[in-house]
Structures are given as C-alpha cells and as structure tokens.
C-alpha cells in the first residue's frame, strides 16, 4: 500500500479492542533503491530497536497492567512498520485481557514478524524495572568551532578525511531530521565506530548538521549516513548507532554495522530518552 494510505499525519480513532490490522508496513526497498543499496546483498547487518513506553493491557481479573517493551526488527526484513500505526496497534491492547505478560509478548512479536516478513525479537518489562542512563561512548565532536550554512538536503561532499589509518569512535548530539510525512522533528544522538581513513571531525559535523531540514524516516537517515561514510573512506569496519528521542511513546534506534558478529548496544539509555 502507498504511504499516502497510512494514518501518519491524519486524525485517528483509537480502537477499543485488539486489532493487528492496524499495523502498516512500508517496504524497505523503496528507500534503499534511492540510496543505491542492493536489498539482496546488503552492505551491513543490524537491527532497528524500538522502545515502547506506553504499553498496557488487562489481566484476567480486568485489572490494568502497564509496562515497557523493546523490539528488534532485523535490517533484512522486507518491511518496516510505520510508527503511528504501531502506536495505535499498541493502544488497541488497553482493554484487551491477557493471561500473562508472556502472552502479550508472544502476540506482539508474532504480529510484528508477520507484517515485517522477518523474525522479530524483543522483551516486555514491568514498569518498575531499573534502567540506567549512560553517556554516548567515544569522542564528542559537538564543541568544535565551525561555521554552518547547509541544513539540507544532506550533502555527502562535506565528508573529508585524512590519508592516515585510525580506529576511533565519535559521537554527536546534533543530529536532527524531520518525519517524511508529518515534518515533525526527529532528534538523535549518533555514535560511530570505524577503522579506516580518519574522518575530519569538523567537516563531518557539518555533514551531520546538513540533515537538519531533511525529511526522511529514521531508518533511511541511518542507512544514508552509513552509505556516505562507506563510499567516502571505504573503512575496514563501520558501525552506526542512532538513538532518537521518543515521539508518541516510541523511540526508534537504528543500528548498522559491517561485522556480522558485532554485539548489540547495552540496554542503557541516553539522557534524552
């Protein structure tokens, strides 16, 4: 179905009962074709990590239960889920009776797997679960004294490098883009690890800032950044992790990396989550 038929950016009615048909799928291939990414031979591995903070249902006695969930959609899935449809879907559980949290988890994982055409994994936690905050790892480049005048579209010609090999990790809290459909701002913290020719931090920060008025989904922004870095310096290793702030009770954190055996980020969150 075309994106114009989704509920994103439209007035919506919340369902009183569980409804898996609320989930709206978006084929990944559309945005990947624009970036020159071969969906049959992806240049990366990874997941989209969805954290949900507004999750509730009824227990067998009719008493409400609330919790939070984390779901992992693999990058080789055929589809992603449109975020507002996921919000409406989760809220359809508000008056739905489940026998256990495990049953709720099973239903959600199965529905997400069905709509994405991939094996989605995840966990649901009680609301009193202790979650620690952390700061992004690596060197922060936000305090560099630069002059900016490009806020979109993203300009990969701004990526410059030195002809010296390094292995480093850098981060920035200045990434911002806008929702492709609604234009609402998406604020993100990005952590980049790579081994290869050294990125010039000042020019790379300008590149990140050039996303400021860009209208793209979070997943496409991550894959654009990954592709632009890969094309610029052809690193031996590269990982991109973007932690977006929540909108509508959901945050999306795309993670892309070149090494299949690379581990997922910790469960710790950054302060803006």
UniProtKB/Swiss-Prot annotation:
Q: What is its main location?
A: cytoplasm
Q: What is its EC number?
A: 1.7.1.13
Q: Which UniProt keywords apply?
A: Cytoplasm, NADP, Oxidoreductase, Queuosine biosynthesis
UniProt KW Nucleotide-binding keyword: no
The answer on whether this UniProt entry bears the keyword Oxidoreductase reads: yes
Q: Name one GO molecular function term.
A: preQ1 synthase activity
Q: What's the catalysed reaction?
A: 7-aminomethyl-7-carbaguanine + 2 NADP(+) = 7-cyano-7-deazaguanine + 2 NADPH + 3 H(+)
Binding positions for NADPH per the UniProt entry: 83-84, 247-248
Question: Where in the sequence is the active site?
Answer: 179, 186
Any one GO BP annotation for this protein:
tRNA modification
Where does the protein end up? Answer: Cytoplasm
Q: What class of enzyme is it?
A: oxidoreductase
Which Pfam families would you find in this protein's record? QueF, QueF_N
> Record-annotated residues binding substrate?
81-83, 218-219
Which pathway is it part of?
tRNA modification; tRNA-queuosine biosynthesis
Recorded GO CC terms: cytoplasm
Main function = Catalyzes the NADPH-dependent reduction of 7-cyano-7-deazaguanine (preQ0) to 7-aminomethyl-7-deazaguanine (preQ1).
Of which family is this protein a member? Belongs to the GTP cyclohydrolase I family. QueF type 2 subfamily.
Q: Which NCBIfam families does the record match to this protein?
A: QueF
Q: How does it assemble?
A: Homodimer.
Q: What is this protein called?
A: NADPH-dependent 7-cyano-7-deazaguanine reductase
Organism, per UniProt?
Rickettsia felis (strain ATCC VR-1525 / URRWXCal2) (Rickettsia azadi)
Gene name for this UniProt entry = queF
């Amino acid at each position: 179905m075309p994106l114009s038929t989704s509920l994103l950016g439209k007035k919506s009615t919340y369902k009183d009962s569980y409804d898996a048909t609320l989930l709206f799928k978006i084929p990944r291939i559309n945005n990947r074709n624009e970036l020159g990414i071969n969906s049959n031979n992806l240049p990366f591995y990874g997941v989209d990590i969805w954290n949900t903070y507004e999750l509730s249902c009824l227990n067998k006695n009719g008493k409400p239960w609330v919790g939070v969930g984390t779901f992992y959609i693999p990058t080789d899935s055929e589809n992603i889920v449109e975020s507002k449809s996921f919000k409406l879907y989760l809220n359809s559980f508000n008056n739905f009776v489940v026998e256990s949290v495990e049953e709720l988890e099973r239903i959600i994982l199965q529905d997400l797997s069905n709509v994405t055409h991939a094996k989605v994994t995840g966990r649901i936690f009680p609301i009193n679960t202790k979650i620690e905050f952390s700061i992004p790892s690596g060197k922060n480049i936000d305090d560099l004294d630069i002059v900016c005048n490009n806020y979109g579209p993203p300009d990969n010609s701004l990526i410059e490098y030195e002809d010296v090999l390094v292995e480093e990790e850098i981060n920035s809290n200045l990434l911002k883009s806008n929702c492709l459909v609604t234009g609402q701002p998406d604020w993100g913290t990005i952590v980049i690890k790579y081994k290869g020719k050294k990125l010039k931090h000042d020019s790379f920060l300008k590149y990140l800032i050039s996303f400021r008025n860009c209208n793209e989904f979070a997943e496409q922004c991550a894959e654009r950044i990954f592709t632009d870095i890969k094309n610029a310096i052809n690193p031996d290793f590269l990982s991109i992790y973007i932690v977006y702030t929540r909108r509508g009770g959901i945050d999306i954190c795309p993670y892309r990396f070149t090494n299949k055996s690379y581990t997922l980020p910790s469960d710790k969150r950054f302060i803006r989550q």
